[in-house]
């Protein structure tokens, strides 16, 4: 898949990192609440082995998504998703749907609908810290 800037993006590129994978759409009210948090998390934790990847499920594609990304100053890669992409994660029935993926590539948490900022941040820190402890001698 390619992002809004034309760069090839694969989830496997972030292997070894804690990844927040967010399925969203420009028309989704709760998604608009979460995206600023994800921008903040990307800024705060990217140097600790954390990454955010957005998957827009907008039917209008880049025509709707690119202006939204510019307006919100989204600082992480976003790709366009579809049914097959959603099925790779067991199906995405409603938006937003967010997965936290650990450094080994396993789904550590799943949130369907709006979850609280502190919920996400606590889980991110837990995954970052547990990975750090596992790496300690």
Question: Predicted segment positions?
Answer:
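A short beta-strand-turn-helix
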Residues: 1-19, 42-45, 89
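Conserved hydrophobic/aromatic "anchor" residues
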Residues: 14, 23-24, 68, 76
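Short pre-active-site segment immediately N-terminal to redox-active cysteine/selenocysteine motifs
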Residues: 17-19, 23-27, 34, 94
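Structural microenvironment flanking redox-active thiols in thiol-disulfide oxidoreductases
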Residues: 32-72, 81-88
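Thiol/disulfide oxidoreductase modules built on the thioredoxin-like
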Residues: 67-75, 80-125
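Non-globular targeting/processing and membrane-anchoring segments
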Residues: 131-137
């Amino acid at each position: 898949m390619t992002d809004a800037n034309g760069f090839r993006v694969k989830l496997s590129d972030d292997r070894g990192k804690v990844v927040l994978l967010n399925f969203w759409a420009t028309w989704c009210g709760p998604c608009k609440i979460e995206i600023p948090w994800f921008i903040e998390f990307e800024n705060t934790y990217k140097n600790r082995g954390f990454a955010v990847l957005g998957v827009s499920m907008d039917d209008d594609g880049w025509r709707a998504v690119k202006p939204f990304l510019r307006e919100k100053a989204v600082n992480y890669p976003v790709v366009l998703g579809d049914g097959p992409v959603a099925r790779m994660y067991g199906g995405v029935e409603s938006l937003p749907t967010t997965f936290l993926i650990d450094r080994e590539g396993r789904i550590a948490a799943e949130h369907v609908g709006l979850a609280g900022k502190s919920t996400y941040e606590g889980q991110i820190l837990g995954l970052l810290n547990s990975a750090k402890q596992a790496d300690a001698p």
